[in-house]
């Protein structure tokens, strides 16, 4: 009697390439800039029996919760013989877990990681003083209804950093800068270079870094 074949079905986000860029950025933000110092990076040779998993990145969150980004390889492609890569993004709490979208994962991450505007910045902006903080993860606010304070502080910080009113092209260029530098850092690591990811850039968000095909 033939043994019945069992399938494991989970929601995943397909990516167009390999995961070196993602691994490189996580290790840089964990060990160099310390922005993700609490995160745990688990490479494929330490995952254990889950041979289809090429890496796990675990982000501890508030209230004993955590976010896990699990990379898969050797998945069956739609056409051809080449392996397909994908990621699964899961949020865990004490009594519940669920898969989440990359946009919502960004919101969860920003609640614990990467600084944002402090409460006193509104008063400093009104008095015309120098802002002492800024948002390093603006992509996390994409699917939220931004407050007037956040919108005003975002405009003020851009205007003062550029010395003039920013155009829409400049705004898009700034948002893409973090992703471009992540790619450059990945190529440097492949070539054995010791140059690191540039400091002071914004985190571009999970979807951008992973190249998810939504």
From Swiss-Prot:
Pfam families: Vif (PF00559). A motif (HCCH motif) lies at residues 110-141. InterPro entries: Vif. GO terms for cellular component: host cell cytoplasm; host cell plasma membrane; membrane; virion component. Its main location: host cell. The keyword Membrane applies. The modification Phosphoserine is found at residue 147. It is a peripheral membrane protein. Induction: Expressed late during infection in a Rev-dependent manner. GO terms for biological process: viral life cycle. It is found in: Host cytoplasm; Host cell membrane; Virion. Processed in virion by the viral protease. Highly phosphorylated on serine and threonine residues. A motif (BC-box-like motif) lies at residues 147-156. The modification Phosphothreonine is found at residue 98. It comes from the Viruses. Keywords: Host cell membrane, Host cytoplasm, Host membrane, Host-virus interaction, Membrane, Phosphoprotein, Ubl conjugation, Ubl conjugation pathway, Virion. The BC-like-box motif mediates the interaction with elongin BC complex. Homomultimer; in vitro and presumably in vivo. Interacts with viral Pr55Gag precursor and host APOBEC3G. The interaction between Vif and APOBEC3G is species-specific, which may play a role in restricting the replication of SIV to their host. Forms an E3 ligase complex by interacting with host CUL5 and elongin BC complex (ELOB and ELOC). Counteracts the innate antiviral activity of APOBEC3G. Forms a complex with host APOBEC3G thus preventing the entry of this lethally hypermutating enzyme into progeny virions. Functions as an adapter molecule, recruiting APOBEC3G to the ubiquitin-proteasome machinery. Targets APOBEC3G for degradation through the assembly with elongin BC complex, CUL5 and RBX1. Binds viral RNA and affects the stability of viral nucleoprotein core. May play a role in viral morphology. Vif-defective viruses show catastrophic failure in reverse transcription due to APOBEC-induced mutations that initiate a DNA base repair pathway and compromise the structural integrity of the ssDNA. In the absence of Vif, the virion is morphologically abnormal. This is Virion infectivity factor.
